[in-house]
Amino acid sequence: MAYQEPNKDGFYGKFGGRFVPETLMTAVLELEKAYRESQADPSFQEELNQLLRQYVGRETPLYYAKNLTQHIGGAKIYLKREDLNHTGAHKINNALGQVWLAKRMGKKKIIAETGAGQHGVATATAAALFNMECTIYMGEEDVKRQALNVFRMELLGAKVEAVTDGSRVLKDAVNAALRSWVANIDDTHYILGSALGPHPFPEIVRDFQSVIGREAKQQYRDLTGQNLPDALVACVGGGSNAIGLFHPFVEDESVAMYGAEAAGFGVDTEHHAATLTKGRPGVLHGSLMDVLQDAHGQILEAFSISAGLDYPGIGPEHSHYHDIKRASYVPVTDEEALEGFQLLSRVEGIIPALESSHAIAFAVKLAKELGPEKSMIVCLSGRGDKDVVQVKDRLEADAAKKGEAHA
């Protein structure tokens, strides 16, 4: 299958596009032009590759999780260790690329939205490196959940704006960042943290994150002597770590691709963020994608234990993969993610982010189904330091509830 997406208008099949007001159209067209010029300039990629090597610490290892594999007794599990990047997650791949692009465009200020805080930290880090002013928009609820990352961003010289609109989470932070961009277009670049938003953002983010899949593909061959794994697994909120892993394999049709969505308390409740399981096409933040919405087209609140996954949409390329049945998207509950979090910590000595724990939880199920002759690559998108206090509180609360039930 020859895969050519997106087309010149930014569509991935029937998803994507550029649904923005006139005030933003100039900015996204300017961004697309600058991005195309950077792609055609070998010095841009050389500089970025050097930064990824020397500053971020790439390439990240592809690690055979022998203990986990033996514990499950199924398919071989290889972890793509994005948690070992500088700043602790995959987000730096995109942030560094976009700040470098903004610098070339002559921009002076950087703005970004963040949920779990990882994209905010990565953007603040890249802005500090390039000596640029930086403001991060973060929902007030997430500011409370991720106090440590808020302090990190401030330490790195960024200003953190707590967003009090709506449900005070990630989608509200995106709205606030877009409003700020409209008001300051001349000297400011907006760094979207996931493969979302109006074209060319989903393409730019995918391209900067595809280093994950390109490395993993070669590393798998070097490690195993085999050509391709049988499956890929990654968590999906907006979907940038997943698209980064999937895209270099999209034409390898023997490789099954699975995105683990946040099912919160369960997809039959109102508390989840399982967009491809329960959503339908709609326009959100400048792009046509699958969205959680009610019968009147109003955007529903997304919910997850993981601040990085509670977004009510998903990147348009994921909607396209789902539509053409190239990838499968599966719901994983908070409870299952917590089990994955504890299991990987216990058997491999690796504490995963709550986001990545959704991928681990599904990988455990899939490994049992596939059996020992098969193998998979799981994207460990980030480390769990930021989540340890939240997990401790949740497990203690759950234990107290169980104690009351038995009393």
Curated annotation (Swiss-Prot):
Record's keyword annotation contains Lyase: yes
InterPro entries: Trp_synth_b_CS, Trp_synth_beta, Trp_synth_beta/beta-like, TrpB-like_PALP, TrpB-like_PALP_sf
GO cellular component, one term: cytoplasm
GO molecular function: tryptophan synthase activity
PROSITE patterns: TRP_SYNTHASE_BETA (PS00168)
Biological or metabolic pathway of the protein: Amino-acid biosynthesis; L-tryptophan biosynthesis; L-tryptophan from chorismate: step 5/5
Cofactor requirement: pyridoxal 5'-phosphate
Modified residues (N6-(pyridoxal phosphate)lysine): 91
Keywords (A to Z) from UniProt: Amino-acid biosynthesis, Aromatic amino acid biosynthesis, Lyase, Pyridoxal phosphate, Tryptophan biosynthesis
Pfam families recorded: PALP
Known EC number: 4.2.1.20
Reactions this protein catalyses: (1S,2R)-1-C-(indol-3-yl)glycerol 3-phosphate + L-serine = D-glyceraldehyde 3-phosphate + L-tryptophan + H2O
CDD domains the record matches: Trp-synth_B (cd06446)
Domain of life: Bacteria
Keyword Protein transport part of the UniProt annotation: no
Family as reported in the entry's similarity comment: Belongs to the TrpB family.
Record's function text: The beta subunit is responsible for the synthesis of L-tryptophan from indole and L-serine.
Description of how the protein assembles with itself and partners: Tetramer of two alpha and two beta chains.
PANTHER family named among the record's database cross-references: TRYPTOPHAN SYNTHASE (PTHR48077:SF3), TRYPTOPHAN SYNTHASE-RELATED (PTHR48077)
Name under which the protein is recorded: Tryptophan synthase beta chain
Organism name: Streptococcus pneumoniae (strain Taiwan19F-14)
